Amino acid sequence: MVAEEDIEKQVLQLIDSFFLKTTLLICSTESSRYQSSTENIFLFDDTWFEDHSELVSELPEIISKWSHYDGRKELPPLVVETYLDLRQLNSSHLVRLKDHEGHLWNVCKGTKKQEIVMERWLIELDNSSPTFKSYSEDETDVNELSKQLVLLFRYLLTLIQLLPTTELYQLLIKSYNGPQNEGSSNPITSTGPLVSIRTCVLDGSKPILSKGRIGLSKPIINTYSNALNESNLPAHLDQKKITPVWTKFGLLRVSVSYRRDWKFEINNTNDELFSARHASVSHNSQGPQNQPEQEGQSDQDIGKRQPQFQQQQQPQQQQQQQQQQQRQHQVQTQQQRQIPDRRSLSLSPCTRANSFEPQSWQKKVYPISRPVQPFKVGSIGSQSASRNPSNSSFFNQPPVHRPSMSSNYGPQMNIEGTSVGSTSKYSSSFGNIRRHSSVKTTENAEKVSKAVKSPLQPQESQEDLMDFVKLLEEKPDLTIKKTSGNNPPNINISDSLIRYQNLKPSNDLLSEDLSVSLSMDPNHTYHRGRSDSHSPLPSISPSMHYGSLNSRMSQGANASHLIARGGGNSSTSALNSRRNSLDKSSNKQGMSGLPPIFGGESTSYHHDNKIQKYNQLGVEEDDDDENDRLLNQMGNSATKFKSSISPRSIDSISSSFIKSRIPIRQPYHYSQPTTAPFQAQAKFHKPANKLIDNGNRSNSNNNNHNGNDAVGVMHNDEDDQDDDLVFFMSDMNLSKEG
């Protein structure tokens, strides 16, 4: 127990030494960064770093809070601030800050602010962070802890010497000890020790006030406003942290936040040379400056300085001309490099008092400092697009020539609208500003200009049309045969009829369907994507319509049907059947919209009287007259139908019958004509038996000598029952029409 208590006391002593020596390194006037002379220099040697029992009497009384830690009470964070003391300045002094590009920014007048905070150190014993709580509980080694603290102190001393405040102090000492030359370029151009660097110790648990001083969080250079760096700090600040040392009571941490810019200058405004230079700069001002603290300057001060400037104007001008001739080339090259593109327009820094800016740089600044007007199209040019509030045309405006813009930029602004006159009544819009922001001509703009070129330039469009017509004339293969939907193409129908008449009996119905599909005009094939209905997509046949197809009844197996019904040869019977089907379709316009080849097919078994009437007709005209009549009727009937359905598709069957009489569901979307031999086809074939009986009765009444042939027909139908199940539509048609 005694050993543990001794170890705990040693650890507490090391914690007290940590707070005291860290504060001493930052605040002591004998630290290495203040070694301007050899007197009263306190050596931070190895003995001082290793001796943790020494108490420093130079520290203020506030440090006593952190000098006697017992391990039970909570230690607040200790804050040490390093600041630039301005209390010795009077109202005639002006404090300015130079940024990294050499531009001067006005900070304040001598009596406006008392301090400018440069650094803020945070020294704390952290016993609540997750890092400390997650640390393993090992036995504390006092010797190891002492070595770690010595390493921390040495690192802290090195860090202090590298901070910007040390450089400011060294230059301040040089300006004190050096010759007081008003024309010199020293950062501190004061006649005495008017400013100094000081430190103060604060309690981190209490709020830190910035009244009467420029706090660390306030950016002097306004280009840093609303900007953060990688460490989530304001852009004008930087931060350094030292690796913490672990103890059983908490982590010993040290961190610092400091200003990046430290090159301050102090000028006396009552100085004659400064007044002359300040007046010359004010005459050649390049925009608003960051001078918020100079608003209290009265007109009397200006009136006092102005006569002085007029009395010494001539000798000062001679001196200025000599300086300008010597430095003109150097100033031009330097300032052209120092002008940043990202520089703030409304908060530009003040120009250095002992330098003159060339006229070329001044001329460049005028268009830059001009405030941007978002409601003007011509942001690149000097004029707006139009001053007329009405919807005036852009072509009435004089063209604004821009060397980097495309010459067709004016017409391009109206591309998205319907017409040129449909633009907004305002002189511009945000869309036009967006297009004006691009200086280079892109590929899209070139394509759009080509597209707009033809309606805007009729001569070139006519030339393009002439070239296109010549191209068509030179290549006759490119001629387009265009036919309207209402007027079907003039196709030689007689050739098709002759082809059907000369078909050999050995050909089956599939070859006929293929011949129909091959004879289709490709110009009248419809695309399925053009249909807007939700019904099953039928197979579309050509817009012109042929007569009744030569079905199996015209072939060798069923040739007796034509003889029995027509009473003549097979060719004349086929012509009569086609003629009858055409007459029937012309009289029944109220039927379903099927072509003449299906004329009355779905309702053929409801018209037995008409069948007998047509069966009693004979061949009364010559073949030529019949062909002419057939062609005329087909030409007239073809115009009444726009499309037909393939004779073998399920859609043709379902569309021809009344839906209430069909005992099966409607077929779904079939992409091609199909023949499905399912049970429903047998039901559809039942009317064929009645048709055969009707045909036998008509033959027995009119043609008794052909009775045996009718029996043969029935025998043939029974033999070909399987085929009739598939191709029953053709049998029904011809048995009805014969």
UniProtKB/Swiss-Prot annotation:
Main location, first listed in the record: cytoplasm
Phosphoprotein is among the record's keywords: yes
Compartmental location: Cytoplasm; Preautophagosomal structure
Impact after mutating S541A: Leads to constitutive activation of autophagy
Presence of the UniProt keyword Cytoplasm in the record: yes
Coiled coil: none
Annotated Gene Ontology cellular component terms: Atg1/ULK1 kinase complex; autophagosome; cytosol; PAS complex; phagophore assembly site; vacuole-isolation membrane contact site
Source organism, top-level taxon: Eukaryota
Gene3D superfamilies: 6.10.140.1900, HORMA domain (3.30.900.10)
UniProt-listed GO biological process terms: autophagosome assembly; autophagy; autophagy of mitochondrion; cellular response to nitrogen starvation; Cvt vesicle assembly; cytoplasm to vacuole targeting by the Cvt pathway; macroautophagy; mitophagy
Positions where Phosphoserine occurs in the chain: S344, S348, S355, S437, S438, S461, S496, S535, S541, S554, S581, S646, S649
GO molecular function terms noted in the UniProt entry: armadillo repeat domain binding; lipid binding; protein kinase regulator activity
Induction comment from the UniProt entry of this chain: Translation is induced by nitrogen starvation. Translational repression during nutrient-rich conditions is dependent on a uORF (upstream open reading frame) present in the 5'-UTR of the mRNA; it promotes ribosome dissociation. Translational induction occurs in conditions reducing translation machinery efficiency, leading to ribosomes scanning over the uORF (leaky-scanning), and increased translation of the mRNA.
Free-text description of this protein's post-translational modifications in UniProt: Phosphorylated; hyperphosphorylated by the TORC1 kinase complex to repress the induction of autophagy in nutrient-replete conditions. Starvation and TOR inactivation results in ATG13 partial dephosphorylation leading to ATG1-binding. Rephosphorylated by ATG1 during prolonged nitrogen starvation. Also phosphorylated by PKA. PKA phosphorylation regulates the association of ATG13 with the PAS. Within this regulatory network, mitochondrial respiratory deficiency suppresses autophagic flux. Hyperphosphorylation in rich medium is impaired in the absence of VAC8.
Region called Disordered, residue ranges: 279-359, 377-462, 521-599, 690-719
Domain notes: The extended 70 Angstroms-longloop of ATG13 specifically binds the highly conserved innergroove formed by the armadillo repeats of VAC8.
Quaternary state and interactors: Hypophosphorylated form interacts with ATG1 to form the ATG1-ATG13 kinase complex. The ATG1-ATG13 complex interacts with the ATG17-ATG29-ATG31 complex through direct interaction with ATG17. The ATG17-ATG29-ATG31 and ATG1-ATG13 supercomplex interacts with the PP2C phosphatases PTC2 and PTC3; to regulate induction of autophagy. Interacts with VAC8 and forms heterotetramers of two VAC8 and two ATG13.
Cited function: Activates the ATG1 kinase in a nutritional condition dependent manner through the TOR pathway, leading to autophagy. Required for autophosphorylation of ATG1 at 'Thr-226' and its dimerization. May also be involved in the regulation of autophagy through SNF1. Involved in ATG9 and ATG23 cycling through the pre-autophagosomal structure. Also involved in cytoplasm to vacuole transport (Cvt) and more specifically in Cvt vesicle formation. Seems to play a role in the switching machinery regulating the conversion between the Cvt pathway and autophagy.
Family: Belongs to the ATG13 family. Fungi subfamily.
Protein name listed in UniProt: Autophagy-related protein 13
